[in-house]
Amino acid sequence: VVLRLYLCLSVILLSSCAINGKWQNEPTNELAQVNSLVIKDLALVGQAEKKPTVAVYPTAFKDDTGQRRGNSSFATFSTAVTQAPHIYLIRALQHSGFFHVVERTGLDNLTKERQIIRSTRENFEEQKPLKPLLFAGLLMEGSVVGYESNVKSGGYGARYLGIGSSKEYRQDTVIVSLRTVSVSTGRILLEVLVTKTILSVAVSQDVFRFVASDTELVEVENGMTENESVNLALQAAIETAVLQTIKEGHDLKYWSIKDE
């Protein structure tokens, strides 16, 4: 009896080794980290001969999908996509080093502070003028135009003599549109559409056996589910859109890259 029990436990232990190595350890608390660009090529794109000045308004780059976070147990009002996607766009533009990005998200606060500075200088008779705000020659607009759940799902498994193993997966997709608009003419200079897959994978093993003359039941389960972060997938899609915008703008001679 002991031997049979030992064999059952040994099989489930060995089968669990099929799970990805990074899943073998239980998750632990980690320190906060400073996020880097997901698309490394964006940081290596090079410098523009003359950096274009661009602006991103919060209302000009938002989630247009209205997609709710999936839940099979109860209704949820949480959205599947962040309601501040413009933050990722601003970050991608800024960290690429290719553009001058002007502040438009907190424009009201910026204007108020400038008014306070002017008022203070007038009261203390300081006539030094305040530098004018930098205006943008280009507007970066667009949105998250699509989020589709369960685009593809499937899996496989096997069971023999009460010992089983299975793997399941599911794919969602997020679609991002990015436009580059000339402020002077209102003309759309560039338009990019990017689709990113979001993958979820579940792996499990189990043992279901009767021991001790079929009077005692042994049941062991082991498994792990990994869901790709929607925010990281969205960040990757937006960074890819910015990278493609830089490449297409260069091909159309809207800007040039140093040391070419």
Predicted regions and their residues:
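Positively charged n-region of N-terminal signal peptides that target proteins for export
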Residues: 1-5
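Bacterial N-terminal signal peptides
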Residues: 6-16
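"Short basic amphipathic alpha-helical interaction patches in structured regions
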Residues: 72-73, 154-162
